[in-house]
Amino acid sequence: MWIADNWQDYSLIDTSGGEKLERGGKYTLVRPDPQVIWDSDKKHPSWRSADASYKRIGGGGSWRINSLPESWNISYGDLTFKIAPSGFKHTGLFPEQAVNWDWFRDLIKNAGRPIKVLNLFAYTGGATVAAAKAGASVVHVDSSKGMVARAKENAQLSGVGEAPIRYIVDDCKKFVEREIRRGNRYDAVIMDPPSYGRGPNGEVWKLEDNIDSLVALISNILSDEPLFFLLNSYTTGLSPLAMRYIVELRLPTQNRTIEAEELGIPTEVDAHVLPCGSSVRVCFGRF
């Protein structure tokens, strides 16, 4: 398991009864999490005094705010992100991804050449900002105008607002198909697809139906000297081994190493690790 344990500005305090208690900056939140299938004593006082909590109601849910601004910032090393609770329990950041940021930032910094990164399903740009901060040029693609706008804010906050980042609102699969026809190539590709979603024109995305064909397309946009490929998943039931097998089948086979693991974040109260999805990492030409 790859564990994101280098945070200072974020912590997973405790978990119990389908919920997690988190601290982001100076604010505490309670949010639902399907991985938390156990009950604990909830002895930590912040369970009762959290600044906000998200409660599921029927097929949806809503935030219950006690004392919380509309948004605030938290940092991970030299990266800074805007946090803003929104619908579907989200805040605009997946902190477990920090362990992946550390991995590919090191690859980019030590590549010894300019690196061009394609970030698909790029959301609010955590990976985009991390790659740009390491010196890469980035093409950031997401179907949501609002998320792309937030990514631009995060780039400004992290000091890479003027970096070579190209922001595109588009259906990711269609964008990749066009890039293949144009002959554009990338040294690294990051994919963080949702379990389910819709494109800007109502296109329906379901991970299980699309992931194999999309990874197959990626092999056609990698440069002659690719650096890395990263695939993330939050789909319950899609194991790291299944994802790894797809990647093994679809990506170039020469000079590569492939690893697949769950991601996790340790809790403050007892140091147990909460599973937070999984990733497949491919490193080309480094052994």
Give residue ranges: language-model regions.
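C-terminal catalytic and target-recognition region of SAM-dependent MTase-like enzymes
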Residues: 226-287
